Design a protein with these regions (language model features):
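Short hydrophobic clusters on alpha-helical segments that form packing/core surfaces
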Residues: 3-8, 182
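Short coil/turn segments at alpha/beta junctions that flank glycine-rich nucleotide-binding fingerprints
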Residues: 10-14, 66, 87, 130-131
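Hydrophobic alpha-helical connector segments
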Residues: 46, 59-88, 139-145, 175
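Short, basic, alpha-helical segments at the C-terminal edge of helix-turn-helix-like DNA-binding modules
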Residues: 48-54
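Helix-loop "lid/cap" segments that line or gate small-molecule binding pockets
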Residues: 61-63, 78-85, 94-100, 182-186
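Hydrophobic/aromatic-rich alpha-helical bundle segments in the mid-to-C-terminal region
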Residues: 89-98, 106, 110, 125-180, ...
Protein backbone atom coordinates (compact mmCIF):
# COMPACT_ATOMS: atom_id res chain seq x y z
CA UNK A 1 0.00 0.00 0.00
CA UNK A 2 2.88 2.38 0.73
CA UNK A 3 4.27 2.02 -2.80
CA UNK A 4 0.84 2.52 -4.37
CA UNK A 5 0.30 5.59 -2.17
CA UNK A 6 3.65 7.01 -3.26
CA UNK A 7 2.72 6.50 -6.93
CA UNK A 8 -0.67 8.12 -6.31
CA UNK A 9 1.08 11.22 -4.96
CA UNK A 10 3.39 11.34 -7.97
CA UNK A 11 0.99 10.49 -10.80
CA UNK A 12 -2.59 10.77 -9.57
CA UNK A 13 -5.14 7.96 -9.72
CA UNK A 14 -5.27 7.67 -13.50
CA UNK A 15 -1.48 7.69 -13.78
CA UNK A 16 -0.90 4.75 -11.44
CA UNK A 17 -0.24 1.39 -13.07
CA UNK A 18 -0.84 -1.71 -10.96
CA UNK A 19 1.78 -3.50 -13.05
CA UNK A 20 4.35 -0.92 -11.97
CA UNK A 21 3.27 -1.21 -8.32
CA UNK A 22 3.44 -5.03 -8.32
CA UNK A 23 6.81 -4.99 -10.07
CA UNK A 24 8.24 -2.52 -7.55
CA UNK A 25 6.86 -4.44 -4.55
CA UNK A 26 7.94 -7.79 -5.99
CA UNK A 27 4.56 -9.51 -6.00
CA UNK A 28 2.50 -10.89 -8.84
CA UNK A 29 -0.61 -9.17 -10.10
CA UNK A 30 -2.74 -12.18 -9.02
CA UNK A 31 -1.33 -11.80 -5.48
CA UNK A 32 -2.41 -8.16 -5.46
CA UNK A 33 -5.88 -9.13 -6.70
CA UNK A 34 -6.08 -11.78 -3.98
CA UNK A 35 -5.87 -9.01 -1.36
CA UNK A 36 -7.79 -6.44 -3.43
CA UNK A 37 -10.26 -8.40 -5.61
CA UNK A 38 -11.76 -5.20 -7.05
CA UNK A 39 -8.29 -4.12 -8.17
CA UNK A 40 -7.05 -0.57 -8.33
CA UNK A 41 -10.22 1.01 -6.96
CA UNK A 42 -10.29 -1.19 -3.86
CA UNK A 43 -6.56 -0.70 -3.27
CA UNK A 44 -6.88 3.08 -3.31
CA UNK A 45 -10.02 3.04 -1.18
CA UNK A 46 -8.01 1.08 1.42
CA UNK A 47 -5.21 3.66 1.16
CA UNK A 48 -7.73 6.49 1.62
CA UNK A 49 -9.21 4.82 4.70
CA UNK A 50 -5.73 4.33 6.15
CA UNK A 51 -4.81 7.98 5.53
CA UNK A 52 -8.10 9.24 7.00
CA UNK A 53 -7.65 7.06 10.08
CA UNK A 54 -4.15 8.50 10.48
CA UNK A 55 -5.66 12.00 10.30
CA UNK A 56 -8.40 11.16 12.79
CA UNK A 57 -5.89 9.82 15.31
CA UNK A 58 -3.58 12.81 14.84
CA UNK A 59 -6.40 15.33 15.19
CA UNK A 60 -7.80 13.63 18.28
CA UNK A 61 -4.34 13.61 19.92
CA UNK A 62 -3.84 17.28 19.06
CA UNK A 63 -7.28 18.23 20.39
CA UNK A 64 -6.99 16.17 23.58
CA UNK A 65 -3.73 17.87 24.55
CA UNK A 66 -5.36 21.30 24.96
CA UNK A 67 -8.07 22.60 27.30
CA UNK A 68 -9.56 25.58 25.44
CA UNK A 69 -11.35 25.73 22.11
CA UNK A 70 -8.87 28.26 20.71
CA UNK A 71 -5.90 26.11 21.76
CA UNK A 72 -7.57 23.03 20.25
CA UNK A 73 -8.03 24.81 16.91
CA UNK A 74 -4.43 26.01 16.97
CA UNK A 75 -3.30 22.42 17.60
CA UNK A 76 -5.51 21.16 14.76
CA UNK A 77 -4.11 23.75 12.36
CA UNK A 78 -0.50 23.04 13.38
CA UNK A 79 -1.04 19.30 12.96
CA UNK A 80 -2.72 19.62 9.56
CA UNK A 81 -0.15 22.12 8.30
CA UNK A 82 2.73 19.90 9.41
CA UNK A 83 1.10 16.81 7.90
CA UNK A 84 0.80 18.64 4.58
CA UNK A 85 4.58 18.92 4.47
CA UNK A 86 4.90 15.15 4.51
CA UNK A 87 4.28 12.92 1.52
CA UNK A 88 0.59 12.22 2.14
CA UNK A 89 -1.23 12.63 -1.17
CA UNK A 90 -4.37 14.06 0.46
CA UNK A 91 -5.32 16.11 -2.62
CA UNK A 92 -5.16 12.99 -4.78
CA UNK A 93 -7.09 10.97 -2.20
CA UNK A 94 -9.75 13.70 -2.07
CA UNK A 95 -9.87 13.59 -5.88
CA UNK A 96 -10.27 9.80 -5.78
CA UNK A 97 -14.05 10.06 -5.39
CA UNK A 98 -14.27 11.19 -9.04
CA UNK A 99 -13.01 7.82 -10.22
CA UNK A 100 -14.73 5.29 -7.96
CA UNK A 101 -18.15 3.69 -7.68
CA UNK A 102 -21.03 5.40 -5.93
CA UNK A 103 -20.73 2.98 -3.01
CA UNK A 104 -17.07 3.90 -2.53
CA UNK A 105 -17.91 7.61 -2.90
CA UNK A 106 -20.35 7.24 0.00
CA UNK A 107 -17.75 5.33 2.05
CA UNK A 108 -15.16 8.04 1.45
CA UNK A 109 -17.60 10.81 2.36
CA UNK A 110 -18.48 9.02 5.60
CA UNK A 111 -14.81 8.40 6.39
CA UNK A 112 -13.97 12.07 5.69
CA UNK A 113 -16.81 13.15 7.95
CA UNK A 114 -15.71 10.87 10.78
CA UNK A 115 -11.98 11.52 10.46
CA UNK A 116 -11.68 15.23 9.74
CA UNK A 117 -14.98 17.00 10.28
CA UNK A 118 -16.19 15.24 13.46
CA UNK A 119 -13.17 15.80 15.74
CA UNK A 120 -13.05 19.50 14.82
CA UNK A 121 -16.84 19.83 15.14
CA UNK A 122 -16.72 18.37 18.65
CA UNK A 123 -14.03 20.87 19.69
CA UNK A 124 -15.95 23.81 18.23
CA UNK A 125 -19.29 22.63 19.67
CA UNK A 126 -17.74 22.36 23.12
CA UNK A 127 -16.29 25.88 22.85
CA UNK A 128 -19.68 27.28 21.75
CA UNK A 129 -21.51 25.45 24.56
CA UNK A 130 -19.03 26.70 27.18
CA UNK A 131 -19.36 30.29 25.97
CA UNK A 132 -15.74 30.53 24.83
CA UNK A 133 -16.93 30.99 21.23
CA UNK A 134 -19.87 33.23 20.36
CA UNK A 135 -23.32 31.79 19.82
CA UNK A 136 -23.15 30.38 16.35
CA UNK A 137 -23.95 27.16 14.58
CA UNK A 138 -21.04 24.76 15.22
CA UNK A 139 -21.67 23.13 11.82
CA UNK A 140 -21.13 26.44 10.04
CA UNK A 141 -18.06 27.25 12.12
CA UNK A 142 -16.58 23.81 11.45
CA UNK A 143 -17.03 24.10 7.68
CA UNK A 144 -15.70 27.67 7.74
CA UNK A 145 -12.62 26.58 9.70
CA UNK A 146 -11.97 23.60 7.41
CA UNK A 147 -12.44 25.78 4.32
CA UNK A 148 -10.03 28.42 5.57
CA UNK A 149 -7.42 25.80 6.47
CA UNK A 150 -7.86 24.01 3.17
CA UNK A 151 -7.43 27.24 1.25
CA UNK A 152 -4.32 28.17 3.18
CA UNK A 153 -2.87 24.69 2.61
CA UNK A 154 -3.36 25.24 -1.13
CA UNK A 155 -1.66 28.64 -0.97
CA UNK A 156 1.17 27.14 1.04
CA UNK A 157 1.69 24.41 -1.57
CA UNK A 158 1.41 26.63 -4.65
CA UNK A 159 4.79 26.96 -6.33
CA UNK A 160 4.28 30.43 -7.80
CA UNK A 161 2.43 33.62 -7.07
CA UNK A 162 3.01 36.42 -4.60
CA UNK A 163 5.43 35.55 -1.84
CA UNK A 164 3.93 34.79 1.53
CA UNK A 165 4.90 37.05 4.41
CA UNK A 166 7.92 35.70 6.28
CA UNK A 167 5.81 34.93 9.37
CA UNK A 168 3.65 32.49 7.40
CA UNK A 169 6.35 30.60 5.53
CA UNK A 170 6.57 27.84 8.11
CA UNK A 171 3.80 25.36 8.94
CA UNK A 172 3.68 26.76 12.47
CA UNK A 173 3.46 30.38 11.30
CA UNK A 174 0.81 29.58 8.70
CA UNK A 175 -1.23 27.67 11.30
CA UNK A 176 -1.05 30.49 13.86
CA UNK A 177 -2.01 33.22 11.41
CA UNK A 178 -4.84 31.16 9.93
CA UNK A 179 -6.38 30.41 13.34
CA UNK A 180 -5.96 34.06 14.39
CA UNK A 181 -7.88 35.09 11.28
CA UNK A 182 -10.62 32.56 12.01
CA UNK A 183 -10.94 33.55 15.67
CA UNK A 184 -10.47 37.32 15.39
CA UNK A 185 -11.48 38.18 11.83
CA UNK A 186 -10.00 41.09 9.94
CA UNK A 187 -11.54 43.98 11.84
CA UNK A 188 -9.27 45.93 14.21
Amino acid sequence: MDVAEMHLGESGYLGVSLEEVTREVGVSKPALYYHFPQGKEQLFIAIAHRALEHHREGLERAIAAHPSGAAKLRAVARWLMSESNQDHPMDELRDLSRFVSEQHQLELAEAFFGSLYSPIHRAISSAVESGEFSENRPEFLTWAFLSLLSGMLQVNNTPSGPALPQATRTAEGMAEHTVDLFLNGVLP
